[in-house]
UniProtKB/Swiss-Prot annotation:
Main function: Involved in the biosynthesis of the siderophore staphyloferrin A. Catalyzes the ATP-dependent condensation of a citryl-D-ornithine intermediate, produced by SfnaD, and citrate to form staphyloferrin A.
The protein's Enzyme Commission number: 6.3.2.57
A Pfam family annotated for this UniProt entry: IucA_IucC
Pathway entry: Siderophore biosynthesis
Lineage: Bacteria, Bacillati, Bacillota, Bacilli, Bacillales
Family listed: Belongs to the IucA/IucC family.
Catalytic activity from the UniProt record: N(5)-[(S)-citryl]-D-ornithine + citrate + ATP = staphyloferrin A + AMP + diphosphate + H(+)
Organism in which the protein naturally occurs: Staphylococcus aureus (strain NCTC 8325 / PS 47)
GO molecular function, one term: acid-amino acid ligase activity
Protein's recorded name: Staphyloferrin A synthase
Keyword ATP-binding included in the entry's annotation: yes
GO BP term (any one): siderophore biosynthetic process
UniProt keyword terms in alphabetical order: ATP-binding, Ligase, Nucleotide-binding
InterPro entries: Aerobactin_biosyn_IucA/IucC_N, IucA/IucC-like_C, LucA/IucC-like
Amino acid sequence: MVYLEWAKADRNIQYRVINAIIKERIYPEQTFISQKGSLIEIQYHMHVLTIEVVRKSALERYEFTGDITYLNKGETSLIITLEGLLDVLNHDFDIPISERLREELIHSRDSLVETYKQMSHRQTLISQSFKFSRLPQDINFFSWLQHVKDSDKTDDLTYSESLVPEGHPTHPLTKTKLPLTMEEVRAYAPEFEKEIPLQIMMIEKDHVVCTAMDGNDQFIIDEIIPEYYNQIRVFLKSLGLKSEDYRAILVHPWQYDHTIGKYFEAWIAKKILIPTPFTILSKATLSFRTMSLIDKPYHVKLPVDAQATSAVRTVSTVTTVDGPKLSYALQNMLNQYPGFKVAMEPFGEYANVDKDRARQLACIIRQKPEIDGKGATVVSASLVNKNPIDQKVIVDSYLEWLNQGITKESITTFIERYAQALIPPLIAFIQNYGIALEAHMQNTVVNLGPHFDIQFLVRDLGGSRIDLETLQHRVSDIKITNDSLIADSIDAVIAKFQHAVIQNQMAELIHHFNQYDCVEETELFNIVQQVVAHAINPTLPHANELKDILFGPTITVKALLNMRMENKVKQYLNIELDNPIKKEV
């Protein structure tokens, strides 16, 4: 069993590397790529890699099967491992894979092995539990979720955060979490469902910068851990310190063990930063360093000095300021659409030191996403992953829960309702306020109810893009601290929407449904195109720019692997692909 999971994970990352090479054109000029029947060949001089294609979707998205074969000067062999593929690419195809990138890819594979083992283990436990419960063996995932939610055994959203074993759908570094060991991956990654104790530390008030929607610097003590108020006061008193001179901050246990001592040893010695014996329980969300506090109505975004996918996941000081400031300034605007909410960020803080160290000791408090509605609330990324209850892809389980089955009618209705609930509010934010929320599948929470009733909540204001001129026209006194939120032009704001919603949300769902013979991919993208066209208000600002970019002949896509090879994670490398919703404007 373990070998099967290893082989499945290894092949998965091999396929992602090949897909990225084709899509991002990561090869020398003399390389020829051709498709012969169901086979794709990558030829460079006397070297040929061949792989079988099951299907291809928009935006150069392939689904492969079988081993990759390698023809080297007339001799054929099979590529058995990721390491073997990387060696061939490096030595025979002149595609430079650095030692660091090799390490990242292998770590992604090894973490994916652990994930697959965990998903198999969960499936075994669940089928055993069905034998001892009165639930039918073939219960639908949504019926099961409602059962456990009603019995207070689990919270549907938190559970769904653990149901994205594939992580990022196309990134070869989907599971990279360097320098974590596999034991640490099992302790802290969301798919392992572990309770994670966050350390409570105290910072002397003149050495911390707090920003609160309500102006309360003691937000964490007063609102999040009031049960510790007396214990913290007594603990500080035992050190000869006064609690009113300190502010609480939450720290991820990995960061506490590996990073805090390295960067803040002098502060700890001077009692500027105080470790305490107190912790608060949490579970990891899909973003790994954003934690859902157990039995508390909050999430907390924390720095973890580790590389997850392409970037090191620290927290920039300016996002701790802008989250609460934007939440306060825009709270009425952000929640004016029925069926579409934005999670407020009431509090943020960071250590008042140089920026590089401050990124390591900071936090943002976010309201826990909650949507009132029947059915189930899940993170959108889970929709295209299998669940361990009925072993179906979650969006398919939803259609079956509606008694619709997988038919042309049910799929087209779902895509239409999903797009109608998600796209018009996001385009209205761009036209009215110059803001594009980063509403990709990891950042959106969806409530799927009966009768195709669909509602959304977007979390994480930190990835937004803002056209300051448009926003200041509506909210004149707003100040943005974080330069990375401010777009160079309205075009960059629209591109953020296009990447998060058209490329990620809609293209991922359509790629999944594209495997069924009853629907055509182009029909589903036509539905998206119509919803977008209808959402653009010709009497409001930026209507022409929205049409030109969203319906243009090409779509700009991040070159995720290439930017890792060039080490340009912050300066995005882009490629142009055919736009699946292009039309004459």
